[in-house]
Amino acid sequence: MRVFLLCAYILLLMVSQLRAVSFPEDDEPLNTVDYHYSRQYPVFRGRPSGNESQHRLDFQLMLKIRDTLYIAGRDQVYTVNLNEMPKTEVIPNKKLTWRSRQQDRENCAMKGKHKDECHNFIKVFVPRNDEMVFVCGTNAFNPMCRYYRLSTLEYDGEEISGLARCPFDARQTNVALFADGKLYSATVADFLASDAVIYRSMGDGSALRTIKYDSKWIKEPHFLHAIEYGNYVYFFFREIAVEHNNLGKAVYSRVARICKNDMGGSQRVLEKHWTSFLKARLNCSVPGDSFFYFDVLQSITDIIQINGIPTVVGVFTTQLNSIPGSAVCAFSMDDIEKVFKGRFKEQKTPDSVWTAVPEDKVPKPRPGCCAKHGLAEAYKTSIDFPDETLSFIKSHPLMDSAVPPIADEPWFTKTRVRYRLTAISVDHSAGPYQNYTVIFVGSEAGMVLKVLAKTSPFSLNDSVLLEEIEAYNHAKCSAENEEDKKVISLQLDKDHHALYVAFSSCIIRIPLSRCERYGSCKKSCIASRDPYCGWLSQGSCGRVTPGMLAEGYEQDTEFGNTAHLGDCHEILPTSTTPDYKIFGGPTSDMEVSSSSVTTMASIPEITPKVIDTWRPKLTSSRKFVVQDDPNTSDFTDPLSGIPKGVRWEVQSGESNQMVHMNVLITCVFAAFVLGAFIAGVAVYCYRDMFVRKNRKIHKDAESAQSCTDSSGSFAKLNGLFDSPVKEYQQNIDSPKLYSNLLTSRKELPPNGDTKSMVMDHRGQPPELAALPTPESTPVLHQKTLQAMKSHSEKAHGHGASRKETPQFFPSSPPPHSPLSHGHIPSAIVLPNATHDYNTSFSNSNAHKAEKKLQNIDHPLTKSSSKRDHRRSVDSRNTLNDLLKHLNDPNSNPKAIMGDIQMAHQNLMLDPMGSMSEVPPKVPNREASLYSPPSTLPRNSPTKRVDVPTTPGVPMTSLERQRGYHKNSSQRHSISAMPKNLNSPNGVLLSRQPSMNRGGYMPTPTGAKVDYIQGTPVSVHLQPSLSRQSSYTSNGTLPRTGLKRTPSLKPDVPPKPSFVPQTPSVRPLNKYTY
C-alpha cells in the first residue's frame, strides 16, 4: 500500500512538472460583452459648472469610504452616494473645489510648464480618522496639503507644505497612508523628480526618509501602493534594477518594508534616515527550464484573505520594449516575511556580480528588525543599534531571494493580445457560499476581464476567463488619444454589486454579472460558470446571493457540466412582447448584447452559441424555426436580422473549426517551397532565353568577315572610328578596296536624299558603321590602261569568292566642292607595291576588258590619259632609282631624302587652279561601309574599278593601323602610327609612298604646321620606321630609318568622344557603282 501511494505521489509530481514546463495558453472568454451592450452602463464625467462645460475630469484616484465613493480629479473632489442606483449618468451629490492661486499659476508658467499642467491635481486623499481627511494637490508645481471634513468636505485648518508628501507633476506616481497617527508617503521631493523618497512625517517623533541619491536604496521608482501589516508598513513599487545594470537597463517589481517604530539612526550612522529599510524582488513568472518573467508591476490590491491566508494580488506585465504580455500573481504575506528573514545580497566591487552575503558576516542584531521586537527586543529604539548593524543595512538593503507567487505560477496570463493589463480588483468572497475568488482586470485598451481564479494548488482546473467586457464608452468619454482608453483604476462595490472602472476622462459603473442575458435557458445559465449567477426555482437565470440559500438554486462553477441538459428551445421576445424594452433604453435592465442568446436585428453579428463554450461565432449551421411552420428552414442571410416570433434551435455540439498548428506549418512551408521552385524555373527560363539570344548574336558576329583583310590603311583623326571594328570574311582579296572606286555619269538627286541608299540589301548589321568608308578615303588618281590590266587579272582570279561573299562598295564623295582645310580627308588609302603595274602581270584580254570599262565608266580626254601615262612612267623610273640607292650599302641617307623630295616635286600634279574636279569633303565617321543597293546592279559582273582623273590632295599621316590579310599573290606594305601626333611619347611611324603614284603634294623639309582639330600645331620631324615591298623579285628592301615630314591634318571642328553607332545618311557623289 505504501509503495502504491509513493508511486502515485511521484506520478503526480511528474504531471505537475510537465504542466509547469508548458507555457499557458490564453483562455477564450466564455462570454463577451461588446460596446453595443456596455454602452447602456451609467457614466460619471464630473459636474460642469459655469463656463466649464468642456472641463475634463483628469481622474487621479478614487476611494470608497463606507457608502460613499470619493473621486479626485483636477481642482475638484467629487462624492457619489453608492446607495443610489444610477440609470444613465452617475451624478455626484457633493463637490470639493480647490484651485491654485493666480500667483502659483503664473510661477508655473515661468518655470516653462504648459498652462494645462498649471492646475491643482489632487494626488493624496487619505483619511486620518473618521472625521478628517488629508488632501494634497500639485498646486501648479508647488504642492500643498490641507485637512477637510469627510461629512461636509469643508476646509479645516491651515495649508501645509506638500513637499515629500505630494508630487510636483500629475503624471508622477505616489502613495500615502496613515499608520499610528503618522503619514507615510512615497513620492519625489523635488521639481526635477530626481530625489525619490519614502518619507514619514506628522505625529510625534522626527521625520525620516530614505538616503538621498543612493541607487542601492531606490532608483527611479514608480510607487503603486502602501499597506500596513503588523509592525511594518509595506510599499509596492517598480524601479530600475541595480543588480541588473551590468546586463542592461531592466525594471523589477519590489516590495519594501519599514518598521513603524523606527526612530532613525545614531548621530554617526543613518541619522534621520530609516534603519529598517529592506526591499525584495517580486517574482511573477512562468516556471520551467527557462523562466518567463513578468517584471513590471502595474497594480496591486490590499491584503485580502485567500483560503484564510493574508494575500496581495497584483497584475504584472512584460518589459516595455518586449512583447506584450500580462499575468496575475498572488503573494502571501508569510512568503514576503520569509524573504525578509533570508540572506542579503551584496556587490563587493562596482564591476563584480551580486552575490549572497554569508550568514556569519551578518551583524547582531539582525539588520531590518524593529526595536523591542524579535531579535532586537533588547533595544528600546533604533537609535541604540550598534554602528555595525546600521552600516550594514545602509549598504545592504536588498535581499538575495525573490518573493515567489502562490503555487509558484501565475493565476492568469494574457499573452496573445496587443494590449497589457493595467489595473486589478478582487472579490475574494464571491458566490452564495463566498468561497470563490473573482478577479477583475482592466487593460490599456479599455477592456475589463472577469476571471474565476484558481486559488488552490490542488485544484484540477485552471483559472477561467468568464467574461470579456468592452467597458470604454466612446460616445460619453472624451478620448483625445489612445492613452485615454487605458483603465487607470478599479473600485469594487460588492454591497451594491457594481464595479467602477476609471478612465482619465470618465468612470463607468458596470454590474458584476449579467445573469439576465441567459434568459430562461438553463443550459446557458449553468455553462456560464459565473459564481454570481444560478438557475433559480422560478425557472430563470438570476443573481445568487448568500441570503438565497434556502430558496434553492442550481449552478456548476467548477466544471459547468451541461451534458445532462437538453438544448434550449426558447421563444425569444419580439417587439410586440409586453415586457420587451427598446435596446439602449434608460430603464432597461434586460438589454441584449451581441453575444446573448436572444438576438436582435440591430446586431447582425449574433450567432447561435454552444452553451458549454459560449463564444460568439458566425457559422453556416445556424437555423431558425418559425413558430407557425413546423418545418425547419435554413436562414441563408446571417446579416439580415431575425424575423419576428422565431424559435432558436441551439446546436448540441460544435465542430472544431480550428486548423491544427502542425498542418498549418506544413502547408505554409510547402507553399514557400513551391513558390521558390516556380520562381527559380521562371528565372532560369528567362535567363536562358537571353543567353541563347546573346550566343546567336555572338556567332553571327564571329561569322562576319574580318575587315583586317583590307589592303588599305586608314588614318584616324580627332577620335574618329572609336567604335569597335568587326572583321569580315577572310576570302575577300586585298586589292578589292583599291579597285572598287568606280565613277559613273549618274549625279545625285538635287536634294541629296540618300536614305534608301544607306542600308545594304543583304541587311548588314549597323555595328559596321564605325569602319572607314569611301567618303573617308581620298580619290585615287587615274592609272594607265596598262596598270589597270593587272588589276583586271587579279579581279578575274578572285571572281568566285566575290560571288560567294557579300561585298561592299562605298560611294565616292561629291566631286565639286571648294578646296579648303575643312575638305581634307581624315583617312586615306596609302599606296603600296601592288599598285605598281608590271607588264608581266598583264595580257591582251585583260587589257582590252579594262580599257572597255574605262571607256564606259570614265570618259576622259586623251590629253589627260597621255599625261597620266607619262607621269606613271616617271614615277616608276624614280622608284627604281630609289631602290638602287636603298640596296647600295654606301649610299648616303641625306642624299636619298633629297632625291625623294626632288621626286615629289617632279611628280606633282597640275596647279590647284586648273583642276577640273576638287577632292571630296571630309566624311562623317559614322558613314556606313555598305554601298546602297541602288548603286550596283544585282547581277553585275565583278569589275576592276578605276578612279577618275581627279588631282590628288595632301595626304595625312596615319593614326591607326589596320590589320591586313596576305595571300600568296599579293603583299601589302602597311604602317601605322599607334599614338597621336601631339603625344609626347609617341613615335611617328609612317610608310614611304610609292614613287610611281602621282598626285601627292610635295613634302617640305623641316618643321611643319599641322592642323589638329582646327588648331595649328607645330610638329617636328621624328624618326619613323617604314617597310616597303619590292617591285621585282630581287628580295625585300632593307628596313632602314627614313624620315618623313608629317602631313597636314584637316582643319575640322572637334567631334564628340561618344557618338552613336548607327550610321547617318551621307550624300553620295556622282561616282557610283
Swiss-Prot record:
Residues 684-1073 are cytoplasmic. Shows growth cone collapsing activity on dorsal root ganglion (DRG) neurons in vitro. May be a stop signal for the DRG neurons in their target areas, and possibly also for other neurons. May also be involved in the maintenance and remodeling of neuronal connections. Ligand of TREM2 with PLXNA1 as coreceptor in dendritic cells, plays a role in the generation of immune responses and skeletal homeostasis. Residues 1-20 form the signal peptide. InterPro entries: Plexin_repeat (IPR002165), PSI (IPR016201), Semap_dom (IPR001627), Semap_dom_sf (IPR036352), Semaphorin (IPR027231), WD40/YVTN_repeat-like_dom_sf (IPR015943). Residues 21-662 are extracellular. Residues 27-512 form the Sema domain. This is Semaphorin-6D. GO terms for molecular function: chemorepellent activity; receptor ligand activity; semaphorin receptor binding. Keywords: Cell membrane, Cytoplasm, Developmental protein, Differentiation, Disulfide bond, Glycoprotein, Membrane, Neurogenesis, Phosphoprotein, Signal, Transmembrane, Transmembrane helix. The chain crosses the membrane at residues 663-683. Residues 514-569 form the PSI domain. CDD domains: Sema_6D. Disulfide bonds join 108-118, 136-145, 259-370, 284-329, 477-506, 515-533, 521-568, 525-541. SMART domains: PSI, Sema. The modification Phosphoserine is found at residues 723, 734, 744, 931, 957, 983. Residues 931-942, 980-995, 1021-1037 have a biased composition (Polar residues). GO terms for biological process: axon guidance; negative regulation of axon extension; negative regulation of smooth muscle cell migration; neural crest cell migration; positive regulation of cell migration; positive regulation of smooth muscle cell migration; semaphorin-plexin signaling pathway; smooth muscle cell migration. Belongs to the semaphorin family. One of its GO terms (cellular component) is Golgi apparatus. It comes from Homo sapiens (Human). Residues 744-775, 787-825, 839-874, 914-1005, 1021-1073 are annotated as: Disordered.
